[in-house]
Structure formats: C-alpha cells, structure tokens
UniProtKB/Swiss-Prot annotation:
A Pfam family of this chain: LamB_YcsF
Main enzyme class: hydrolase
Family: Belongs to the LamB/PxpA family.
Molecular function GO terms recorded: 5-oxoprolinase (ATP-hydrolyzing) activity; ATP binding
Species the sequence originates in: Escherichia coli O17:K52:H18 (strain UMN026 / ExPEC)
NCBIfam families on file: PRK05406.1-1, PRK05406.1-3, PRK05406.1-4, PRK05406.1-5
Name the UniProt record assigns to this protein: 5-oxoprolinase subunit A
Amino acid sequence: MKIDLNADLGEGYASDAELLTLVSSANIACGFHAGDAQTMQACVREAIKNGVAIGAHPSFPDRENFGRRAMQLPPETVYAQTLYQIGALAAITRAQGGVMCHVKPHGMLYNQAAKEAQLADAIARAVYACDPALILVGLAGSELIRAGKQYGLTTREEVFADRGYQADGSLVPRSQPGALIENEEQALEQTLEMVQHGRVKSITGEWATVTAQTVCLHGDGEHALAFARRLRSTFAEKGIVVAA
C-alpha cells in the first residue's frame, strides 16, 4: 500500500526544513495568506534537495486572517488570483531546475471549494490553464475533486490526520468544538482507519466513507514534527509506503 504525505509550508513556521525530510509532497504558500517571493524560493530549494514533490498553495487574498476568512468573490476573480499564484510558484520552481507537480488550495478557499461548485470550477479551470499535467488536491469526495475530473485533471483526494469530521465527510469548522484532534493516539488511529479502511468516525459517532490518497500534516501544530515522525514510523510498521 502507498500513501502520499503532504504538509503546508512557507507559512512562517520554523519546522519547514525538518518537515521536508518527512513528507512526500509540499504545498507552498504563494503570498496571498502567507509567504513571499523569498520564502517561496527557499521552500522550493529545500523541497528539491529532499526529493519532495512541489505544489502551489493558493489562497484568498487574506493575510490578516491567514486565509481563514470566508469570502464571496466572483468566479473570474478567483480564477485570475489562482492562476497568478500558481504561475508565480511555477516560475520560481522552474528557475531552480525543479518541476511543479500539484496544486492544493488553502484555508477557506479550500473549504468553500469543497462545497461550492462555481468556486471549484474556477480553481480547476485555473489549474488546467496553467498546466493540464498538474494534480489537483482537494477534500475527499468534494466539489473540487469533481471539478478537477470534469477538466480531465488528475485529482488527489485528501484526508486530515488532525481534524475532526462531520457525518457527511466534511471537516468540522475550526470555530466549532472537535475541529482539531490534539490527542496523538486518536489522530494516529483516525489516520490508519482512513488509509487502510477508507472510513472515518465523525464527531457524532457515525462512520463516513472517505478515499484517502494523501494525508495532510499541519506544520503549525505544537507537536507537528513529533507527530510526523510517529506517523512515518507507524506507516513503516504497517508496510505502508510514503510516496507522492
């Protein structure tokens, strides 16, 4: 069995370099919620050095709230902003002799695109316009995955090690209790259940079906590195290969 392990990087946390030795894919902030040209360049350099797949992590224009504020923007605006961010990271990657592999939206752009078909379409269209060979990463079973498939893109369905799930397979909003799983054992158990058995227990106790093609590790958690190491060793024990 094989699984991709991804992390959101270039967001101002000190653990980036070490996380890049543990993950197989990196989603690099493109300046709209965090990061700038120099952090993008540094992250790309480290990712290439570690053989990690490079991806763009576009966001709503919302540095003040770290891209976590809901926005209602016209689809054409989202298309242009997404294309702008993807293009910037693609150029920085190419200049260093690397190849950009995927795109994963950030924060509320990701969450809204999981449920809003027009927004999902705008993002998928931007990815396709930039490079039809790019992989589009989205929440398992979401509108974003459906939109990517409609454009003929390769999609990668994502699950979260440290997030609570609702009965419909969507994430518990960060503003609500149960959104974040702080207990390491619980997060490990949830991850293995999703990867090995394709299901996750919701905060209300029901099982939801999920397709786990990539697991997200949040680099901003207090114990991010320790958990990443634990997850890697657990995967190794279970014969699960980590690869993009």
